[in-house]
Amino acid sequence: MEIEPPQAVEVVDPEVRSYVYSLVTALGGTAGNETGRYVLGDDALGCLRDLKKWLRFYDEKLNRMDVARCLAECKLLNGDLVPIISLYGDAEQSDKHKARIMLACLELLVPLTWPVEVHGQMTFNHHRHTPYLQYSQVEYKRGILGFAPSPILRALIRVGLPSMAIPRSERSTRDEGIIRLMLYFFRNIAVISSPPNLPIDSDDDKATRSATINAFQQQDVFALLLTMCSNMGNDFTFQDVIILEILFNLVKGVDVDQLFKLNERAGTIKTDDLQDILQKEDELNREHSKNAPTRHGRFGTMIWVKRDDEKLSTVSGQDVLKGDRATFLKMDKTKKWNKPKFKREVVDPSSNNFNLKVRLTSSATKHLRTFVEEFLDSGFNPLFTHLRKAIEREADRVTESTSRQFWYAVSWFLHAERARREHQKETRQRSKGTSREIEPDSFSLVASVLNQETFVGLNRFMQHSIDFKDWQDLTAGMKCLTQILLTVQEMAISPLEEDQEIAENIQSRIFYEETTHDRVLSILRNYKDQGFWYLDACTELAHVFLRMLEQYSKQNVDMQVRSRRRARRKQAQAAVPNQNETEAGGEHDSDTEDIAEAHQTVTERSFDFKRFSVRFCTQKSVDTFVALTKYYRELDSEQLKRAHRFFYRVAFKQDMSVLLFRVDIISLLFKMIKGPEGLDPSKPPFKDWEELIRQIFKKLVRKLGERPELVVELLFSKINATVFYLEYGHEKQTMSESRPATELELKPGSASTLDEKIRIVVSALIQEDKKPLVKWLSQVLGSAASERLSWEMEAEARATSSPQEQSDRSKAPSIAVLPEDDGCRTAMFRNARLRLLMRLAGLERLDEDVLGASWMIPSSVPSSNLKEYHELIEKHCESPAEDIDGVDPRDLMRRKRTAADTDSSRHEFTENVNFGSDSEGEDDGVLFPPNLPERSKALKTLKQRRRRRRRSDDAEESGPDEAVLEARRTAREKNALERQRKIKSDLYVHASDDESDEEADIEFFAKEEMRRQAQARRVAEALETGMPENNTTKKKSKASAGRKRKVKPVLELDDDDSEASPPKRRRSDEVIESDSDGELMVGIGSTSPRRSQTPPTSADNIFGSEKSPSPMFPWSVGVDQMMAKLQGKDEASADNGESNEDEGEDVLSGTGRTRRRRTMGGFVIGSDSDS
């Protein structure tokens, strides 16, 4: 039987092939010209248009590739189109026929070079033609870039220049189409690359990335792109997406750090790379030689291995004879796990893949670096701002891959900007002293991607990628967020203050969102077979995010984060607007539950890094970094350092080393150091890893010795419920305590009288069905009013009979407030509105604020007040208000913010921060200055000093020796210092207490009125005499200078002040009151150059221009004391018509001397009056 020869399979319809071939033949050729020059046919323009119709109406409409296959077989592009473009590329624009032919060629070039995509909806015809077309497109690119007679790309730029020169408002649809075709062709040239599964015949580099970059630079494509990018949004609007694709395909996979290395170091780096490759090859050969077959082992070897369970296994190979360890390693290598395979969508691995590294030639590196620098300087902000807005509004030109390309391009160029700055810094350091210093550039060149709109878009993009499990998009988003964080970190250390402020603002915006923290955590925890590049991106993001967040939280102790819990409560309230707290079934009563939850929300927003870092230290996070560490032989130093830092944080910073105590993890760590195939000891990270692993093993051995049962846990992953017990050997002690209701207060302006306040609170309680509590409080107040009235009447009767007994019992006894049942007792602790009503009624709490604390009516509340409270509550209880001026009474109350709340929240931040010594030692100094001596005490002190001097003169010869005196002096100073540290100065205490002291207020205003009257009399006398009062006081002070003994002031002048006048002339202090606001005016408007250190009063801050005194010596001039002294001097001046200057010399001995004030007509002239 004869075998029939196989028949040739027609891959294309013969009729279609004949039509296409006839059109290509009629287009033209070189056969009719002896010089080999291409000659067009008679109707070349018609042939070009017919070919375009065949591509459009046959291939595109019928979803076939037959026409493209025929054109590739007959070599239309390299044989016809490229020669035609070179022939007419330099033609004048006025030649319409040649311009049309050039445009027709461009219309064919674009579909022929359009990238062939591999997707899940490919037909049988697509699978047949795709490999051939991919190979043909590589040939197309090689022919276009390597055409020697003339530059093809520059000729095609000339096709689009007339349309680009037209203003955007005047361009037609045809002009926009020509510009788009030109850019699409450049995009196609950038995209086409040699497919990895197809062989390449030629060894040249005409189709590589380096050849593309060199051609773009030499044929002015980069100049065209820079022009369009810098004018994006003005002259060009619809070309942004195409330009993004060109940039993406030019820079993807390019190592940014290598791009900006110094030329002197480039050769060294290449040599180092070559040495590393050769060293890796030697290691592989060495490992292979250990197990390589020899001529004596050609017959093979097989042995039996007896395992622990008395079972036998067979292992082949001579290498198993070396020992037990080699035998078991061979057994482990032969084990295979048939992992179940799931059907996944077919995706072209080369499509939009930005992870594959690309190496460039030196010329391409130089050209690309030049283009990137110029693009960052002029085109980055306009292009990416326009792109972001187009993506946000989902413009028609935006495709599925646009967002991915956008975020990757942002990350790449941000990395390039940081690398360029580092390159410039190294250049300045190398040329330091040889050229003038150049001011550092601002980060405003990349400001368009560092605003809030970009962060919102990036968060939305990452969340969308997580929801739809688009891991390639998520990888681009993670890379972008990482580069943004690193750029902000560089901005924070910039010498420009503006950049530092912007960096602080950006960090606060990024770290303020708790959703960002949760997203980074979920990405790290949920890694599962997404690939190495996804693993590398997520671990890098977690490492950078955690490190920067730690630094930021240390710098901002009061850091706050916005939680999503509050939004959920608002949604729940919106869904059930009329549901009250009783129906909700909460633990708290009425609206107190909402207020307590709101307080809890505010507390949860207070960020604690220690608590947050614990969330990173989980078994899933450890598994992710373990998956990265398994590639330790392929990882670089930065990636190894990243994993090392995480394991160190888990084991030693967080004391969660038990998470690493698992058999596979321990085996991996041991293999990294001891081998086989471990880390290279010559690499820098080896020593760090060796020390870390040694400490981990040391910890493991110690814990196994303490708790041998932990051996069982080495087989399993750890869960959060048992991690603490496994680490410390005991359960975590948690104490739950009930918190009281949050203190409330009425909103400002809601009520001005006691009646209105009680009306609001009572109405709010009754609206929540708490009328029994209001009735109970009313009864308590009624009975208390009767009891207090009886005591007052009894006390009045007792006073008339025996005044001595009345003085012994001057205060009424306090009245205890007892709850009627357990529900009332709980409401006194948990119901915030009832507690507010109790405080309005004068009740006070005795003990600590816990459940069952005692409340009482203090003795200071008279019966009349209690009766008034009782009547007001009864009145509003009988007729409560449903709303007050159209507002719900419950909305007129708010949470009361107290200093205790602020201190407690602040303590939560600062409990782990070292602020120095906690004790009040010598470094802390005196916390409060002692109270100033009163007038009588000052005179008494002066007299005692005189007596001591006389006694010391008489007993000078019989005194103790120097050693005893020195010991006594040291003891006195030590005791005085200890006393001063314990002093709570009366000045500082009264600064806040006097605000609520009615008696002190009455006394203060009485003194103020007396001072105003005295000042008015002095002014009137000065106006009548027409002479300033200071003249008389000056004469009188000179006359009395010899009689009075002057006391040396306690505080000395500055050096500059003491040199301005002789030290013998000491003038006493002058104190002048301001009749406008009663403030103390010191040292204002003096013409003397001398100025002493004066207390920093408000007037001194406004008018004084000198430096304020040091805060180490706080001025504690008591207001009450000074006013009392001034009042006495004013009265003496008003009665006797004498100056108060002489008295001030002895009285105000504790204050610094001030310069003399200028007066005119009895008024003090300040510095602002000179003008």
UniProtKB/Swiss-Prot annotation:
The biased composition feature labelled Acidic residues covers 954-964
GO terms classed as biological process = DNA repair; DNA replication checkpoint signaling; meiotic cell cycle; replication fork arrest
State where composition is biased (Basic residues): 938-950, 1033-1048
Q: Where is this region: Disordered?
A: 568-592, 880-1171
Superkingdom per UniProt: Eukaryota
| InterPro entries linked | Timeless (IPR044998), Timeless_N (IPR006906)
- A Pfam family annotated for this UniProt entry: TIMELESS
Q: Where is the composition biased (Polar residues)?
A: 1085-1100
Sorted keywords for this record are: Cell cycle, DNA damage, DNA repair, DNA replication inhibitor, Meiosis, Nucleus
Q: Looking at the UniProt record for this protein, which Gene Ontology cellular component terms does it annotate, in alphabetical order?
A: replication fork protection complex
- Give the molecular function GO annotations: DNA binding
Where found in the cell?
A: Nucleus
Q: Where is the composition biased (Basic and acidic residues)?
A: 887-910, 965-993
Which PANTHER family does the entry link to?
A: PROTEIN TIMELESS HOMOLOG, TIMEOUT/TIMELESS-2
Q: Quaternary arrangement and interactors, per the entry?
A: Component of the fork protection complex (FPC) consisting of TOF1 and CSM3.
Q: Which family does it belong to?
A: Belongs to the timeless family.
What this protein is reported to do is described as: Forms a fork protection complex (FPC) with CSM3 and which is required for chromosome segregation during meiosis and DNA damage repair. FPC coordinates leading and lagging strand synthesis and moves with the replication fork. FPC stabilizes replication forks in a configuration that is recognized by replication checkpoint sensors.
> What protein name does the entry list?
Topoisomerase 1-associated factor 1
Q: Which organism is it from?
A: Coccidioides immitis (strain RS) (Valley fever fungus)
